[in-house]
Amino acid sequence: MHGLLLAGLLALPMNVLAHPAEQHASNVLSRRGVDIESFRLPLKAKYMDSDAAAQKIQAMSFSKDDDYVSTATKLVKSTFPKSTFRVVDDHYIGTNGIGHVHFKQTAHGLDIDNSDFNVNIGRDGKVFSFGNSFFTGEIPKENPMVKRAFSDPVKALKGAVKALNLPVKSDNAKAKTTAGKESFEFMGTTGALSAPKANLVYLQKEDGTLALTWRVETDVGDNWLLTYVDAHNSETVHNVVDYVASAEFKVFAWGLNDPTEGNPTSIRDPWTDSSPYTWHSDGMTKYPTTRGNNAIAQDNPTGGSTYINNYRPQSPNLIFNYPWSPTATPPSSYKDFSITQLFYTTNRFHDLLYSFGFNEAAGNFQVNNGNKGGRGNDFAIVNAQDGSGTNNANFATPPDGSPGRMRMYNWTTARPNRDGCLEAGIVIHEYAHGLSNRLCGGPANSGCLNALESGGMGEGWGDFYATAIRLKPRDTKDTNYSMGAWAANNPKGIRAYLYSTNLQTNPYMYTSVNSLREVHQIGTVWATMLYDLMWALIEAHGGTYSANPVFRNGVPQDGRHLAMKLVMDGMALQPCNPNFVQARDAILDADRALTNSANKCTIWKAFAKRGLGYGAKYDARNRTGSNRLPPGC
């Protein structure tokens, strides 16, 4: 799927931040009276972990080919011999030696947009694991391209605008053919940040049938949407995907989450080998400002869509040393410091993730990929003090090759108001949306975390990385952490519970998800499990609180960084739109690929503690928990 995800930090209005029960998403769509949750389709993906895959392959008398893409293709053909499909052009080999290949099912030459197959090939060239959400029902016998009885794309655009109450003027819209089958771009519209687009695709419906739809793409700033409008009835919308997920320098150094944890210090040349051009060059041009290969940071007080000519601090000698005081007001009075801090945190996280394997081929955010794979020209556009909102943040993740966009807002929860850029955990949470959306389903598909449970895990991954990075040497497994506490001016933070290994402090279990209906609530459950997992690995391997992990044969040598690496590797292994059980299995498979399952029982025990143990089962309305361990543990 040509996808983009907009993820936000919060899902509740600020007047209820202190309440333990989070409310529905307070994004721009909901302010227009549109409930995007009502358009989410249920999870359909299946995942065959490495153990099950080995048995399956043996039963099929399946042999590998010389090329990992050919081996993966052979598996898809063997699994669905009557289906047609195409190889998505985003395959790569990760730093753990696993090859990742993605496929899209087709019908009559058109994509079935939510029908995906991902195959993971091991170092030995054999199938390691795989997952799929292929359509298994009856393909329509009639080729729609023969009679062409479907509506034109302009009607679909108008249908999307009307159904979602979008601020797009489409009265004079005209469709212009672009590259690709039944692919169009709209001229004569206003209100969108870029020209809306439409593609004719099939979509699996909840009732098990296919619908011919126009996938209408509209970027309206706070929402970057793929709206699936019925191709025979433009008033019917079957599904909506939102790409925006509601994340010398004088800065708060890496590891300091917010101003309560320390003071700004001067840091010289903080980049690592992950940024060979430094943070101020893209390999072609050197920039005396907060711009480089990985990110471009600026203020955006009007909340507008343009950025290239926005204000950013200039320093010919690259000394970004600006004043800040906790009593300074308004936030615009220290915008130089704010932009510098945002630029620093974004680049620092880029470099850490690169060391774990989120590199060019995996779809990271860089202008110049240096002939290392992937699609370039897609640094992260990061806006400080963005005027399009308050008390929140978001990150838009289009597919590889298009820039990500982060909007960081001011928070009106304290006097003086607080700047979200100064809470590193919020920036990290937002950037982690870019990570998970590029890895899950492949760099070319940003629509693989758009179901309720998978979207919840997207929020959970953001909280997990934000929390893992802020750990201090004095911390133990009994240390509890909040999320967003400084910005929200609330020591309990913005989640229902603190992140804690204590079941009394945080009672969330796998079956808690049965009663939750919002992605940030579900994400808190997932991040809680990952917090337990991290501490289990720290107890097994020790903890290091240095800024950069130490690797031996590609394996981080401490439990904290090992947890971050395994969680990230699991994202690339799991199927499009996974559930908790599949994501757990993918982390176990990630450990098998990286350490030959050296941490298998440690991982199982951590998940079993929260009811996601051996025998736990997924059902959208009645998940079954288990505290059991598998044989051998």
Swiss-Prot record:
Query: GO cellular component annotations, sorted alphabetically?
Result: extracellular region
Looking up InterPro entries in the UniProt record yields:
FTP_domain, Fungal_virulence_M36, Peptidase_M36, Peptidase_M4/M1_CTD_sf
Its Enzyme Commission number? 3.4.24.-
A single GO BP: proteolysis
Assigned keywords, A-Z: Glycoprotein, Hydrolase, Metal-binding, Metalloprotease, Protease, Secreted, Signal, Virulence, Zinc, Zymogen
Q: Which Pfam families match?
A: FTP (PF07504), Peptidase_M36 (PF02128)
Q: Where is the signal peptide?
A: 1-18
Q: Where in the cell is it found?
A: Secreted
Annotated propeptide span(s): 19-246
The family classification in the record reads: Belongs to the peptidase M36 family.
Name listed for the protein in its UniProt record: Extracellular metalloproteinase 3
